[in-house]
């Protein structure tokens, strides 16, 4: 997923895509084997990483954990960047998996977390990653997905672009569960932000499958020629032990999106 642009230049798209998927699978496997209970939620003290503290326009605090690239800037003119949600829980596993594979050491991982002492800050992620909720059901507070996207687009991305030379054709978003749902929402509503979205066990069932409305609008815009989906991709992963309906939801979404491959979207 990180190497689609480079893959086309090398005329080896299948090989490069498999390599990219292998890197991400290695990171996910490391995460699952370690378990959330052992995930690092402390201050980042990992070799080859740094940490930033940032605020959104509304004053919400974020802890940004960055896995630094190794070596010279790639021949593409910039480093591939992966934005990783739920950074407190997942950053150490992804950072270790990246450094263990030589071909991906030039990537930058930007993990978005919170200044809390727990791997998963359920109240913050419930707000940041979700659609608006009815007032009587809005506990914990939800509905901050567009504000969170604003923070990423208007504050975090400019800082990353200032700190590193970024290959703008190699910007990815990775999220799990609610994070996967959020990643798909980002693709449907702001397809220009990320070239690649990886949604691991996405919560497609949430709010009576609220994403269907955004999917229909996205598909309509694509067929009308309003979107440039060249080199855009959506990769959805589910485990074979998940609920059958959750697996089926992912398969059906993939089938529906196949009609957009004519416009460049890979799913």
Short names for language-model regions:
Residues 26-35:
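Bacterial N-terminal signal peptides
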């Amino acid at each position: 997923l990180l190497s689609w642009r480079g893959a086309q230049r090398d005329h080896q798209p299948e090989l490069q895509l498999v390599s990219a998927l292998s890197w991400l699978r290695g990171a996910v496997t490391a995460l699952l084997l370690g378990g959330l209970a052992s995930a690092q939620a402390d201050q980042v003290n990992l070799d080859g990483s740094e940490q930033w503290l940032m605020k959104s326009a509304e004053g919400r605090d974020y802890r940004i954990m960055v896995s630094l690239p190794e070596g010279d800037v790639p021949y593409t003119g910039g480093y591939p960047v992966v934005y990783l949600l739920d950074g407190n829980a997942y950053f150490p596993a992804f950072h270790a998996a990246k450094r263990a594979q030589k071909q991906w050491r030039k990537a930058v991982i930007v993990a978005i977390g919170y200044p809390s002492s727990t791997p998963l800050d359920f109240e913050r992620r419930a707000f940041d990653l979700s659609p608006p909720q009815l007032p009587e059901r809005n506990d914990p507070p939800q509905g901050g997905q567009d504000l969170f996207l604003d923070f990423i687009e208007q504050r975090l991305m400019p800082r990353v672009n200032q700190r590193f030379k970024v290959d703008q054709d190699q910007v990815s978003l990775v999220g799990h569960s609610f994070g996967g749902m959020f990643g798909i929402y980002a693709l449907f509503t702001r397809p220009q932000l990320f070239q690649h979205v990886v949604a691991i066990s996405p919560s497609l069932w949430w709010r009576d499958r609220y994403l269907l409305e955004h999917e229909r609008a996205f598909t309509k815009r694509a067929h009308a020629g309003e979107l440039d989906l060249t080199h855009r991709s959506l990769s959805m992963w589910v485990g074979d032990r998940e609920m059958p309906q959750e697996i089926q939801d992912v398969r059906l979404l993939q089938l529906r999106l196949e009609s957009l491959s004519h416009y460049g979207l890979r799913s």
